[in-house]
Amino acid sequence: MPWDGCELWVGEVSPEGALENIRWVAGGTHESIFQPEWSPAGVLYFSSDRNGWWNLQRISDAGQIESVFPTKGELGMPQWVFGTSQYAFASDELIVCSHIKQGVSQLALLDLRNQKLEEIDCPFTDIQYLRATADYAVFRAGSPTEVAAIARLNLETKRIDTLRLANDLEVFPAYFSIPRPIEFPTEAGLTAHGLSLIHI
């Protein structure tokens, strides 16, 4: 499956619509590639799990793969459905992203020039389908106690507004179990991360 291993290829589209100059870029049997995107400046970015985590990479001017921001978190996810996006370009130098640590999504701004990640205070723990402009980012969001919603982040003020809820049912947070992050050993000395509901 693509979350186990897949390949990223690049080609040029001729005036007649044919693909030309097709070449392999990254990936393979044991490397998963997620969400290839062209930056506004025409640089190819993508997430790769080559270091054990889906981290953001890009192709340099010399054609080499560069790690953009190494972290022990996921900037990617299994593609159970198509069209998911965990990051979006607000500009050449700013990426809005949702990186996952211990099974929980964290909304953040990645400053490409200064290599700094600014986490945004956010009530949501599941953030997907990010899209961005120079002023705003929109995304689908939810949490164990919040119904799914479309939310908007103001990139200047960092304010998050809920634009639309999936339904208008009243939610009572006390009725819901809150999952806890867990980790456990797996094969080859690796560690798996997830969420657990513990009932006592």
Task: Cite the ranges covered by each PLM segment.
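A flexible loop/linker signature enriched in serine peptidases of the S9 family
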Residues: 1-10, 24-34, 46-58, 70-81, ...
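Short loop/turn segments that connect beta-strands within beta-propeller blades
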Residues: 13-17, 60-63, 111-115, 155-156
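Beta-propeller fold detector
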Residues: 20-26, 65-72, 118-121, 160-166
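Hydrophobic beta-strand positions that form the internal "hydrophobic ladder"
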Residues: 44-45, 95, 137
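Signature of short aromatic-glycine-proline-rich micro-motifs recurring in repeat-based ectodomains
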Residues: 81-90
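An N-terminal hydrophobic leader/cap segment in hydrolases
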Residues: 144-182
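Conserved small/polar residues in nucleotide/adenosyl-binding loops
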Residues: 198-200
